[in-house]
């Protein structure tokens, strides 16, 4: 994980593998981190990844599956089929759209379908899209 700050690049963690922070590429980029990783370890050509549109990823941690998420057209569910336990990542939601207002509105519609502790993260994402 790397962050661009006013003081420069802050490196939190480098992992020579796919990483949770890149799961948004499954729906928001021209090529996913998974395909890029496979290409790298099998010495295949590495096309440059291109961001298709703004994306938001929501980690699902200790959260039961809710099929109502899929009623929202921008939501892509990635469910890991793990036993749900507190603190365990069981999936993630990717939302991607070129229209940031539509993306923010979908996040707003998603809020009541998620546990209350997700609200602050959703609010933060909406602020980044504004």
Where are the predicted features?
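Short, solvent-exposed loop/turn elements at beta->coil junctions and helix N-caps
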Residues: 1-3, 81
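Short acidic-glycine loop/turn motifs at beta-strand connectors
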Residues: 4-7, 97-99
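Active-site "cap" helix and flanking loop/linker of ATP-utilizing ligase/carboxylase catalytic domains
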Residues: 5-6, 15-63
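Glycine-rich active-site loop/lid that clamps phosphate-bearing ligands
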Residues: 51-85
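Generic C-terminus detector
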Residues: 81-130
């Amino acid at each position: 994980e790397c962050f661009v700050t006013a003081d420069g690049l802050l490196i939190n963690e480098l992992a020579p593998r796919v990483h949770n922070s890149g799961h948004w590429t499954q729906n928001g980029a021209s090529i996913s981190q998974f395909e890029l990783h496979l290409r790298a370890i099998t010495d295949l050509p590495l096309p440059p990844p291109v961001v298709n549109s703004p994306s938001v990823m929501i980690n699902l941690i200790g959260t039961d599956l809710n099929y109502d998420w899929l009623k929202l057209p921008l939501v892509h569910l990635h469910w890991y089929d793990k036993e749900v336990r507190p603190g365990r990542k069981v999936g993630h939601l990717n939302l991607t759209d070129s229209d940031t207002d539509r993306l923010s509105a979908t996040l707003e519609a998603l809020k009541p379908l998620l546990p209350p502790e997700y609200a602050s993260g959703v609010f933060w994402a909406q602020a980044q899209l504004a």
